[in-house]
Swiss-Prot record:
Belongs to the bacterial ribosomal protein bL36 family. The keyword Ribosomal protein applies. The lineage of its organism: Bacteria, Pseudomonadati, Pseudomonadota, Gammaproteobacteria, Enterobacterales. It comes from Citrobacter koseri (strain ATCC BAA-895 / CDC 4225-83 / SGSC4696). This is Large ribosomal subunit protein bL36. The keyword Ribonucleoprotein applies.
């Protein structure tokens, strides 16, 4: 899963890509091609 600042380009990669909001974060999911999954936001620091 990619972590991106903006999902604008991620949602246009494939016609089956959808934007879903879960737990206050935006996700792009693609059931036909799962390699296009993405989430908007920053990685958590350890």
């Amino acid at each position: 899963m990619q972590v991106l600042n903006s999902l604008r380009s991620a949602k246009q990669r494939h016609p089956d890509c959808q934007i879903v909001k879960r737990k206050g974060r935006l996700y792009v999911i693609c059931k036909s091609n799962p390699r296009f999954k993405a989430v908007q936001g920053r990685k958590k620091r350890r």
